[in-house]
A protein has these predicted regions:
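A short, polar beta-strand/turn micro-motif
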Residues: 1-51, 68-172
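N-terminal post-signal-peptidase region of extra-cytosolic proteins
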Residues: 64-66
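C-terminal outer-membrane/trafficking sorting elements
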Residues: 170-202
Length: 202
């Protein structure tokens, strides 16, 4: 294929692998200092070809989600990025991999999940979803994850309401919502407040 254009928030699927001479991911990333965005792409590249710092999910310890600096960007693997350019990805002559059924980096009961299709999610007694918005992950009772974006999924009935986020050992924010006195603010996956101070069980 001479060129491949990936349109942000629009579905993508590659039934089989192919090579593209040029790739354009049509998305404007924020270049605000320390602004964290999420992404998943269908091709690999060197981190030296990315304008910004890329981080991959590493572990969850003591209610803290740890991400570490990535040494490479793998196809179909979810990442976080602190971009230094609006279009931080430059790639030519890339192999676009076939789209897998699942795109997850798993550690214990937690997974960093990516998608190329719009996904409707509902947190319940066994699964809790955290969507990334406005510089932090927020707990979502219900929400929509758009193509080329990522989220955190906890398959643990004891998933906490809040989780600290660390990038290379540095705390950057809070994952989740305040659950003071058993009440929580309910957000959707875009970080918009849906209901304020409702019972945590609802």
């Amino acid at each position: 294929v001479a060129s491949l254009k990936l349109t942000d928030a629009q579905p993508f699927n590659a039934p089989t692998a192919f090579t593209a001479t040029t790739v354009n991911y049509d998305r404007a990333f924020s270049t605000e200092a320390n602004y964290i965005s999420s992404f998943v792409l269908p091709y690999s590249m060197n981190v030296s070809d990315v304008q910004g710092e890329v981080y991959e999910f590493a572990s969850v310890e003591a209610n803290t989600i740890n991400f570490k600096k990535a040494t490479t960007v793998e196809a179909n693997k979810p990442y976080l990025i602190v971009a230094t350019a609006a279009n931080p990805f430059k790639a030519t002559n890339v192999k676009v991999e076939a789209t897998p059924a699942v795109m997850e980096t798993v550690n214990g009961d937690y997974a960093h999940v990516g998608t190329y299709t719009k996904q409707e999610v509902i947190s319940d007694a066994t699964t809790t979803y955290y969507g990334y918005a406005n510089g932090q992950f927020v707990k979502a009772n219900t929400g929509t994850l758009n193509p080329f974006r990522t989220m955190i999924k906890a398959t643990n009935t004891a998933a906490p309401a809040t989780l600290s986020l660390k990038l290379d050992g540095e705390v950057t924010g809070i994952v989740g919502v305040n659950s003071e006195l058993g009440k929580v603010n309910v957000y959707n996956l875009e970080g918009k407040l849906v209901r304020s101070q409702v019972a945590a069980a609802t």
